[in-house]
């Protein structure tokens, strides 16, 4: 069996630019065949042609708007039906950074559709197939804003908080099986998402923006290390342990039938 057949096919959403494009490059370099998904067919084919020429791997493209129900269903069916697929990178995402009152209903709906609905449905399609074969890896791209909210990130942070909770739950579901689930939580990263967010990357403090290539390389290193949660820019791994431990303690402390004493003061 060839190395490429062993590695299988990797699906990357949002593959025409940014982190997705770099993921496609790195996975092709490792020997994966690819199924690349993004809205613009011309950009997708340009990326695919470059990867075929550079690495000699098989690269398929599927132009789809994951905010559109019909397109999402097509991609979900493709992921579920192809037994060669061993890896899904759920990277596609949208960001509008503005107070809720200054965000249009269309912008709000688009973030919900792509960041939550599409990610959840594609995760469902992939994990159902992976669990049936007891093999496969799901990578969901979240954000550090999934556990920290700014005055301009209420909607975006809310969608990424879903990614955090949803993916952590999936990790519990597949524990002890041959299926792996990784949650990647980048901080500010130099990608074209900033052009649409309403906040130019140049407005961020110097030294706080990671290059996209470094972010993906760190995320893949975390995957190789077997990390459940990868924060590419956080040096002190104990911070993550403290955060997850505190969350577990808070949940444990809530498991009582009685109100907290501070709510029982008499008038």
Question: What are the language-model segments listed below?
Answer:
Residues 99-100, 107-112:
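Substrate-binding pocket helix/loop in short-chain dehydrogenase/reductase
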Residues 30-46:
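Conserved glycine-rich Rossmann-like NAD(P)H-binding loop of the short-chain dehydrogenase/reductase
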Residues 123, 159:
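Active-site helix of classical SDR
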Residues 16-17:
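Conserved glycine-rich cofactor-binding loop
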């Amino acid at each position: 069996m060839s190395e490429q057949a062993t590695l299988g096919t990797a699906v990357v959403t949002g593959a025409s630019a940014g982190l997705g494009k770099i993921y496609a490059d790195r996975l092709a370099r490792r020997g994966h065949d690819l199924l690349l998904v993004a809205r613009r067919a011309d950009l997708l084919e340009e990326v695919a042609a470059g990867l075929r020429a550079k690495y000699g791997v098989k690269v398929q493209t599927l132009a789809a708007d994951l905010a559109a129900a019909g397109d999402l269903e097509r991609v979900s069916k493709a992921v579920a039906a192809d037994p060669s697929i061993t890896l899904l990178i759920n990277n596609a995402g949208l960001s509008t950074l503005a107070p809720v009152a200054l965000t249009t209903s269309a912008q709000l709906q688009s973030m919900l559709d792509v960041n939550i609905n599409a990610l959840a449905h594609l995760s469902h399609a992939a994990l159902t197939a992976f669990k049936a074969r007891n093999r496969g890896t799901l990578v969901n791209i979240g954000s550090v804003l999934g556990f920290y909210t700014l005055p301009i990130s209420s909607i975006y942070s809310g969608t990424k908080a879903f990614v955090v909770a949803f993916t952590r739950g999936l990790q519990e579901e597949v524990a002890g099986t041959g299926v792996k689930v990784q949650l990647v939580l980048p901080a500010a990263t130099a990608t074209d998402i900033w052009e649409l967010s309403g906040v130019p990357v140049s407005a961020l403090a110097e030294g706080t923006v990671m290059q996209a290539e470094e972010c993906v390389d760190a995320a893949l290193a975390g995957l190789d290390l077997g990390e459940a949660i990868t924060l590419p820019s956080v040096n002190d791994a104990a911070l993550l342990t403290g955060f997850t431990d505190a969350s577990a303690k808070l949940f444990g402390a809530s498991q009582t039938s009685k109100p907290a004493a501070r709510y029982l003061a008499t008038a």
